[in-house]
Amino acid sequence: MSYLILVRHGQSIWNLENRFTGWVDVDLNDNGRAQAKKAGDLIKEQKINIDLYYSSFQLRAKNTLKIIQEQLDDNKKVKFAWELNERHYGSLTGLNKDEMKKKLGEEKVHQFRRSWDLRPDPLDKNNSYHPLNINTYKDVPVEKIPDTESLKDTYERVIKYYSCLLYTSPSPRDNPA
């Protein structure tokens, strides 16, 4: 039987501060590291042999997976893909969610966060939080880097990546070494 295990990163420093994070490289906090350890323990309890690991480029996701692999005593290589990144929140990036509700109104912030095809205003390319200014994304083609994304944009990016994986990547079990 094949499994697809999806794990969200553990709590990050900005999650705790209630900030829009998006593509900014924010690390896990202590609680996030404990959550990742627990996720690893839960997977280990199920005795699932994991063939392939994939992660977004984001530090919080990478470190969550690293901790999970430590719990599983598994050092298989990981395929990192920017296409698996979280949604890019545009001009909301780095801002406190509660402060933005006071400034823009709760309904407007809710629309930005939950509407299918509404994008927040784009993040200025000169902003230090823009992916063009973050070393993590230096090898991503500039035309692929968004200034903002809707949920629909994010969905389409991630589904396109998963679809390519599902239809082009054979399981290592199909081709034993």
What are these regions (language model features)?
Residues 1-4:
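Extreme N-terminal starter segment of soluble prokaryotic enzymes
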Residues 11-26:
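Glycine-rich N-terminal loop/short-helix segment of MobA-like nucleotidyltransferase
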Residues 18, 131-142:
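Short, basic/glycine-rich phosphate-binding loops at helix/coil junctions
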Residues 24-37:
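Short catalytic helix/loop segments, enriched in acidic residues and glycine
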Residues 39-131, 137, 148, 155, ...:
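Phosphate-coordination/substrate-recognition cap region in phosphate-metabolizing enzymes
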Residues 167-170, 174-177:
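Single conserved hydrophobic/aromatic residue that forms the stacking wall/gate
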